[in-house]
Amino acid sequence: MLKLRQLQQQKQQQLAKNAGSSVKANTNSTSPAKLRLQKDIEELELPPTVRVNIISLDNHKEMSLNIIIIPDEGFYKGGKFRFTATFLETYPIDPPKVICNNKIFHPNIDPHGKICLNILREDWSPALDLQCIVLGLLSLFQEPNGNDPLNKEAAEVLNKDKLEFGNLVRLAMSGAMVGSTYYECVI
């Protein structure tokens, strides 16, 4: 897998070649949101448990990234969880839309992929960046929060019996039914 900086440099070279102009001239016509996201990507320092792949930075209305979290500790250790982050032209004024692409048994992620992470809602600030988003997603797996749930069933078990919660997480991660919901294998 190419490193993000190499991928970005290749993309800039390709854009410059296609436009018949320098990278610097091409950057001047780029939207503020795209420039900010490119800066965020350049400055990104990923822990070994996280990967980020660029889906598209060329779309004029939105830019998308895949974020893969592979926790190395806690209840979700060994799982591979995929997220899509979509950045609109209003980024960084507005937060990106982030969804989980896997159906997982987690108190802060509902079965449809909606995520309960304050920095993606009311605590968002333009000072936050892609690094903060990645660390926020990683924290969901290190410290799931049963007091602010989207998945009430998972939150109830977490708050009541952490050992049982761990057993149900393992069962769900292996691709099984928990309660009335089937969770896909992410191990």
From Swiss-Prot:
Keyword tags: ATP-binding, Nucleotide-binding, Transferase, Ubl conjugation pathway
TM regions (residue ranges): none
Coiled coil: none
MF (Gene Ontology): ATP binding; NEDD8 conjugating enzyme activity
Compositional bias ranges of the Polar residues kind: 19-32
Job of this protein: Accepts the ubiquitin-like protein NEDD8/RUB1 from the UBA3-ULA1 E1 complex and catalyzes its covalent attachment to other proteins.
Active-site residue list: C116
Keyword Transcription regulation part of the UniProt annotation: no
Catalytic activity from the UniProt record: [E1 NEDD8-activating enzyme]-S-[NEDD8 protein]-yl-L-cysteine + [E2 NEDD8-conjugating enzyme]-L-cysteine = [E1 NEDD8-activating enzyme]-L-cysteine + [E2 NEDD8-conjugating enzyme]-S-[NEDD8-protein]-yl-L-cysteine
InterPro entries membership: Ub_conjugating_enzyme, UBQ-conjugat_E2_core, UBQ-conjugating_AS, UBQ-conjugating_enzyme/RWD
Biological process (GO), any one: protein neddylation
Region (Disordered): 11-34
Known EC number: 2.3.2.34
Statement: the UniProt record of this protein carries the keyword Nucleotide-binding: yes
Organism listed in the record: Candida glabrata (strain ATCC 2001 / BCRC 20586 / JCM 3761 / NBRC 0622 / NRRL Y-65 / CBS 138)
Residue ranges annotated for the UBC core domain, each copy included: 32-178
Name of the protein described by the UniProt record: NEDD8-conjugating enzyme UBC12
Pathway assigned in UniProt: Protein modification; protein neddylation
Cited PROSITE patterns: UBC_1, UBC_2
Superkingdom of the organism of origin: Eukaryota
Pfam families xrefs: UQ_con
Similarity-based family: Belongs to the ubiquitin-conjugating enzyme family. UBC12 subfamily.
